[in-house]
């Protein structure tokens, strides 16, 4: 709905060159939140605490939608651990959001796979709503890079693997560094 409204506004803008500053400000206000990451609150497996996106608005956030049964998701973990180790103290938070696993399944998984960043879960209705709010996650893994003030800066709709796709990995690192410097 917002996208259609956005295009309507842009079309109107292009057809009319007589907009004053007040009208331009109204258009900007209406369209500002189109690329905002939707707020959520999910539980952390390891810390047994809650994570809310809006509380982290002064951080750069990498949200990785994944599942324990997903092979490429498992392959990303070491690279994300490295990114977390390198950039967490500089303001990057990585959140692994499980799209289908229970807390018990995740605890069992974490006994085998070392994940240094927070792994989040929620009941399936909450997760499904989050996936919908983020425009639908059509494949996993899917990763969202979110800048300060919760603006979505980049979406990676596949595995980000340093070894197998160094260009995508370099793009991610480049964008993280830019966002951290803002």
Language-model regions: role of each:
Residues 60-61, 141:
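Alpha/beta-hydrolase fold active-site loops
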Residues 19-53:
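N-terminal "domain-start" segment that seeds a small globular fold
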Residues 4-13:
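Sec-dependent N-terminal signal peptides
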Residues 63, 95, 120:
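Rossmann-like NAD(H)/NADP(H) cofactor-binding core
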Residues 75-114, 124-131:
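Structural microenvironment flanking redox-active thiols in thiol-disulfide oxidoreductases
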Residues 57, 65-82:
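Conserved redox-active cysteine motifs that mediate thiol-disulfide chemistry
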